[in-house]
Amino acid sequence: CPFEVIDTMYKDAFTKFEPEYILPFLKNVASSYINNDVRLSDGRIGKVVLINENALSLPIVQCEDEFIDLSKTRGLTVSAIL
């Protein structure tokens, strides 16, 4: 899943990459998934509605009428882009 790659690269941003280049790159990659349907790790299907600038791999996802901030929901992640 692309959000797992974003998470891995973000963790290495200050040790293996130049932060002034990798952080804007990761932000743009994450933002490209806004309005994409995703499957969450609990099986629910939702749509990425907003990228969290402090946790690029944990966007805000809309599942039906509920908005889920993955950065505040422990253990819940995007498992697949649909």
How would you label these PLM feature ranges?
Residues 1-82:
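Terminal helices and disordered tails flanking the catalytic cores of nucleotide-processing hydrolases
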